[in-house]
């Protein structure tokens, strides 16, 4: 499978968003956008309103990674209404709501993404992995750019590819963070 370039907008210069997006559009497959609430990770990033503004300057798909504590359907609805094409949810925040969230995202015609933190396991996803479109592996501790890759994450990615092959699943995989070598 060919590699695809999905730049994260976390480290962009927010004073020059349009110029940067227009420069990346010819090369990007889609954009990765983080919504962080200071509780999930000690950082803050963009809001759903930014997604709506971004939608005005690019037609590329938007993968919105919701990194918030106490996530609910209202947050998922807000990012979909703003223009998200893929809604990526942190596995450790799903709990008993996982099937409700997946169903809602599908009903709204969007793709389902699941994000595995560095310590999460693929075992955690076994009951719903067949319903996932994009499986994201955090290569760093969530919340901050420019960290060093946590090497064992690469083993999890290989394991996911093996499971996908064995079971005939169709999810794509991506790594988020630490891809600087």
Regions found by a protein language model. Give the residues of each.
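Short gly/ser/thr-rich secondary-structure transition/capping motifs
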Residues: 115-119
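Short acidic, glycine/proline-enriched helix-loop-strand junctions
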Residues: 101, 107-110
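A short, flexible beta-alpha/helix-coil linker loop
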Residues: 37-38, 140-144
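Conserved N-terminal beta1-alpha1 strand-loop-helix module at the mouth
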Residues: 1-88, 94-97, 111-112, 125-132, ...
